[in-house]
Amino acid sequence: MMTNAKLTRPEFLETEADYENAPEGTIVACEDSPPWHKFGSEWSSVIAYGVQDDKGMSRAIRQVLRWGWGE
C-alpha cells in the first residue's frame, strides 16, 4: 500500500482503486450526493446516514474536496 507522501491529490475519484488508495480523512462529493468522508477502509456520510466500501463508492465519480487530513 502507498503512503500519503507517494500519492498525489487527484481532482476526482472514479474507480474502486481510486477510492481504495485515497488516504483516511479524504472528503469527496458530487452534485447529486452529500459529502462522504473516509475513515479507515469505509466511507461515511452523516447526511445520507450511510456507510459504503470502496466498491460501493466507485458507482459514482466524485470530486475530491480534501485529500487525507489536509496536512
Residue ranges and their predicted role:
Residues 1-71:
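Structural boundary micro-motifs
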